[in-house]
Amino acid sequence: MGKCSGRCTLVAFCCLQLVAALQRQIFDFLGYQWAPILANFLHIMAVILGIFGTVQYRSRYLILYAAWLVLWVGWNAFIICFYLEVGQLSQDRDFIMTFNTSLHRSWWMENGPGCLVTPVLNSRLALEDHHVISVTGCLLDYPYIEALSSALQIFLALFGFVFACYVSKVFLEEEDSFDFIGGFDSYGYQAPQKTSHLQLQPLYTSG
């Protein structure tokens, strides 16, 4: 019962991670955020690997999944620091999320709750193929939305890491006990004896 509850809980957290990652991937595509798009894709693959390892009792896959979650927590912590401009990070100077290929910002910058977008015409700050806009009235600014999204990812990843370690430990213990009992013992297996068909012939002796 304990093993089933642990596996079921891990699968549930993996499904939540998958839904959250797909939702985030959609909004990152809309905002042309190439670095998060790549990271989200790798995360989706790792979560699918974790689900497969849980269902198929593959402890190695769960270990790989848990190792990825450590990197995932670090990435999301960096995103929080980036959008909140911790230390020397600056959104106006660093365009890490787009690999410095464009000036696009988060999709939530213009489409956040209550945001009113006003184009600024004939602005000297406008670059070629770009336009300047003014965003006002947002109930929650986009840096905080991105930070909350990353915080949710960290929360799910921490719980997923704990349950992945627990379930993989259970799987490894079961494998060890199976070996100890003799699951792979050659002496526990006896080959079926081949039956031979012999024809009896009468024996004649000379008197």
UniProtKB/Swiss-Prot annotation:
Tissue spec. comment = Detected in the brain only and specifically in neurons. Expressed in multiple regions such as cerebral cortex, thalamus, hippocampus, olfactory bulb and brainstem as well as in cerebellum with high expression in granular cell layer.
| Topology term for the membrane | Multi-pass membrane protein
Q: Does the keyword Phosphoprotein apply?
A: no
Source organism, top-level taxon: Eukaryota
| Transmembrane segments annotated in the record for this chain | 2-22, 35-55, 62-82, 147-167
User: What Pfam family is a match, any one?
Assistant: NKAIN
| GO MF, one example | ATPase binding
What does the UniProt keyword field contain? Cell membrane, Glycoprotein, Membrane, Transmembrane, Transmembrane helix
Q: Which InterPro entries match?
A: Na/K-Atpase_Interacting
Query: Which compartment or compartments is the protein found in?
Result: Cell membrane
Residues bearing glycans: N100
One of the record's GO cellular component terms: plasma membrane
The answer, when asked if Ion transport is one of the entry's keywords, is no
Q: Which family does it belong to?
A: Belongs to the NKAIN family.
Describe the subunit structure. Interacts with ATP1B1 C-terminus.
Any idea what this protein is called?
Sodium/potassium-transporting ATPase subunit beta-1-interacting protein 1
